[in-house]
């Protein structure tokens, strides 16, 4: 196959597996609805400086990630595709960086393509590409900063070196505007030991200052603007989002230190079987500069994230590009030597996982059916398992010819699995679809009320309104609700009947509830019995008409 045919086929695969599925399923709560609503509010209200969630101050992240999601909605519409396109573009750009860096490191087209394909099909990377959150964007900026660092260090001229360091600073600045100070820390974690090992610390001091200047030029305009607008922003963002998350006893998502070690293996599926051989080869080549650079990029951020008390699976996404390059390099070396042991092992692993998934599905369907009268969704999940099994079998039987078969497994998974979810999961986790079914009933509502932030943000995004009152919940909006002017945006349980009576005198009230517990059922029981009610799974929508004083 010619190079032109290869790239044409990959572009078709990108459209089919990454772009087409973006509009095939609703927004997942809590992340997708939150980011969709915040960015939509920026687009509609014109405030591009201070992030607001449901009209309340929301200082957990800077603004660039919201800008990109808002740009997607501005260009493609306030729809599922528009909300998610920023993540796909960021992932595609990271894949391109994997290709370019591999080409610069080893100057071999086959290795470059293999590294890019492995990275694009890593389960965690591919899965997040169609999910509207900030991690794919942040990962791209970190990747760009470290690729720029290598280009600067490997430059053959002073001009190229200057451009590399400037690009490093610009990427750090955009990463900071996306997710904060980590965008500065991670490149330093890699650059400092590598340049000390290379005995180039003078270059680090000189050109590093240029990178810092470039980063400041990107960050300072917004940093000063948000400080002028919201004097408390930097205190909250630094202490709550960085210090408390890293070292606080009450850190969110607390996990043991070893949490990321098994997760790293899972994140590499369907290529995890190549990990031992790739790490072994990296150890044998440990004195080579490219391998040292990639190893530092993989291990030092991984160690930093492992030391943090707060951990989420997506935090390690910046560690996966160097791992893909190490694995792709080892893979091509084995293909050239005709060594099929690792490839056969990887194929057997994927085949075993598919058979295990099939057995688990059969067991659940017999004991407590996951799919109830949902033949199409069941067919889709069987198709995913079948593709995974076929890819594993092909790589096991024909390892040197079908080495790329796991690509099919990964891409079929991300394309079909969201649409293959059972109805009870869809009803519980994507409330915007339920809201979309009742837009006519909701459009005339004077007041909106919800007991769940995910449902509230879905309601706000679909109706293009931020004024949803919270019913006996605060959650991550506790800080925004602490401002006196917003104290009435949350109604405690004891006051709900009085609040509803006053609100209904002003116009109709739409109440969207998620019913997951006894306390939620009690919240539902406190609502007046008149009006219209609609139910879908654990979602209840009540339209309470206006009453006379």
From Swiss-Prot:
Which branch of life, at top level? Bacteria
Subcellular location per the Swiss-Prot or TrEMBL entry: Cell inner membrane
Membrane-spanning intervals of the chain:
9-29, 80-100, 112-132, 136-156, 166-186, 204-224, 256-276, 288-308, 312-332, 346-366, 376-396, 402-422
- Provide the Gene Ontology terms for cellular component: plasma membrane
Question: What does the similarity note say?
Answer: Belongs to the glycosyltransferase 83 family.
Q: What does this protein do?
A: Catalyzes the transfer of the L-Ara4N moiety of the glycolipid undecaprenyl phosphate-alpha-L-Ara4N to lipid A. The modified arabinose is attached to lipid A and is required for resistance to polymyxin and cationic antimicrobial peptides.
Its recorded name reads Undecaprenyl phosphate-alpha-4-amino-4-deoxy-L-arabinose arabinosyl transferase
Which organism is this protein's natural source?
Pseudomonas aeruginosa (strain UCBPP-PA14)
Lineage, opening ranks: Bacteria, Pseudomonadati, Pseudomonadota, Gammaproteobacteria, Pseudomonadales
- By which gene is this protein encoded? arnT
């Amino acid at each position: 196959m010619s190079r032109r045919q290869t790239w044409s086929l990959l572009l078709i695969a990108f459209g089919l597996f990454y772009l087409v599925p973006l509009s095939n399923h609703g927004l997942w709560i809590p992340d997708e609805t939150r980011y969709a609503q915040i960015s939509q509010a920026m687009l509609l209200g014109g405030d591009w400086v201070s992030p607001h969630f449901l009209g309340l101050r929301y200082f957990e992240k800077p603004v660039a990630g919201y800008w990109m999601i808002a740009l997607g909605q501005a260009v493609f519409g306030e729809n599922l595709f528009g909300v998610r396109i920023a993540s796909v573009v960021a992932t595609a750009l990271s894949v391109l960086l994997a290709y370019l860096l591999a080409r610069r490191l080893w100057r071999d087209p086959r290795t470059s393509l293999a590294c890019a394909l492995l990275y694009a099909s890593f389960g965690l990377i591919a899965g997040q590409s169609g999910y509207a959150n900030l991690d794919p964007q942040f990962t791209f900026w970190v990747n760009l900063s470290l690729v720029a660092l290598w280009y600067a260090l490997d430059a053959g001229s002073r001009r190229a070196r200057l451009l590399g360091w400037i690009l490093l600073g610009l990427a750090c600045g955009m990463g900071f505007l996306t997710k904060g100070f980590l965008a500065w820390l991670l490149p330093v974690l890699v650059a400092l030991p590598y340049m000390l090992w290379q005995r180039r610390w003078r270059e680090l001091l000189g050109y590093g200052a240029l990178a810092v200047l470039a980063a400041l030029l990107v960050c300072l305009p917004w940093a000063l603007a948000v400080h002028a607008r919201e004097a408390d922003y930097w205190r909250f963002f630094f202490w709550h989002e960085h210090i408390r998350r890293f070292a606080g006893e009450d850190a969110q998502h607390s996990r043991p230190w070893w949490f990321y070690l098994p997760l790293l293996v899972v994140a590499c599926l369907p290529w995890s079987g190549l990990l031992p051989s790739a790490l072994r080869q990296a150890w044998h080549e440990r004195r080579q500069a490219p391998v040292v650079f990639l190893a530092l990029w993989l291990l030092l951020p991984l160690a930093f994230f492992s030391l943090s008390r707060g951990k989420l699976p997506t935090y390690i996404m910046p560690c996966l590009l160097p791992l893909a390059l190490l694995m792709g390099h080892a893979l091509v070396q084995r293909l050239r030597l005709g060594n099929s042991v690792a490839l056969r092992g990887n194929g057997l692993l994927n085949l075993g996982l598919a058979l295990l998934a099939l057995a688990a599905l059969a067991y659940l369907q017999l004991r407590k059916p996951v799919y109830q009268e949902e033949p199409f969704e069941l067919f889709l999940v069987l198709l995913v398992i079948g593709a995974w099994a076929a890819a594993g079998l092909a790589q096991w039987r024909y390892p040197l010819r079908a080495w790329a078969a796991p690509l099919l497994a990964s891409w079929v998974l991300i394309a079909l699995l969201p649409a293959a979810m059972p109805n009870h999961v869809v009803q519980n986790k994507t409330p915007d679809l339920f809201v979309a079914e009742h837009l006519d009933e909701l459009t005339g509502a004077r007041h909106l009320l919800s007991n769940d932030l995910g449902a509230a943000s879905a309601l706000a995004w679909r109706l293009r309104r931020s004024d949803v009152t919270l019913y006996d919940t605060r959650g991550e909006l506790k800080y925004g609700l602490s401002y006196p002017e917003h104290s009435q945006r949350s109604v405690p349980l004891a006051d709900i009947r009085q609040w509803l009576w006053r609100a209904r005198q002003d116009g109709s009230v739409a109440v969207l509830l998620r019913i997951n517990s006894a306390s939620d059922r009690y919240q539902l029981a406190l609502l007046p019995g008149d009006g219209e009610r609609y139910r879908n799974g654990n979602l209840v929508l009540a339209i309470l008409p206006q009453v006379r004083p």
